[in-house]
């Protein structure tokens, strides 16, 4: 999963209160950051979700 989609899913899981998905997507995003070191455009992702 690409980091932008992972961030979207993480934010949706947080909003839904889904602890298991939140932890899973957070782990995926953390792995991506450790490999690539770059976060997706958080502001753009939030705007797409609202």
Residue map of PLM features:
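N-terminal acidic leader/helix
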Residues: 1-23, 41
């Amino acid at each position: 999963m690409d980091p932008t989609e992972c961030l979207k899913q993480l934010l949706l899981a947080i909003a839904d209160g889904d602890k298991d998905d939140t932890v899973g997507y957070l782990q995926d995003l953390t792995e991506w950051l450790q490999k690539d070191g770059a976060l997706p455009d958080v502001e753009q992702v939030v705007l797409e979700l609202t």
